[in-house]
């Protein structure tokens, strides 16, 4: 079912409609909420939602063989629709960060009204997934973000597929994001981050789509007559396990590695060349073995900027339960 959960009049054109798509089987025991497009440049997440909407419509119409709806699934594909339509991270009308507006205010500014609608429609779910990508100028290998997960959240994370989970930075900004509002409401939830902003990677989305469907099977809101949900190994990394590679000079950063690769201590991440002469002026090296989870994508860098984030290997890092 397609539903407009908020419509905001615009003086310059048609109203801004916040859409929610939902499917319901019987009996309804669990609800899973999936949210994408909190920023306008989260193209992978918005496309992934559209892929999921098409699939679930086919399941509901009994076109997709072997799948049966047994619970409630709701998808909000484009939270920051005005920014998405402009091709920007933030909407130029107010230039407010949507993910710093939660839990929102239904009588507040436009961003606060949107945040309030999203939160009210998802807060009573049993499971939640937020689709995200790397910050501007960076690219993320697929990974999960979760804070102090209990055993149920850990099992939920294992159903999604990415091999690594990270701990979010505990900052004032975290308290204002949708994910933190969910966790404070004791809603088992994760952030799934992959790819880079303003870029659509369809092959990556297909891989992530398979994991999303598997997670729906694990929660029980979706059933397949021929197969059960898979359980993937997940390596949990706290903040102390993250190792950064910094630029030793400013210039053009020419990368030599790709996100998602295993890096050896002393391995060259790339080269920084002088923007005028092309002379190599720095060769950043990894300071430890690790999984390359985030890599600088924009080539112009300044001295001491972060070029890469590695997740250092640990002896006991897989969740034991």
What residue spans do the PLM features occupy?
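Structured catalytic-domain cores with a bias toward divalent-metal coordination
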Residues: 1-321
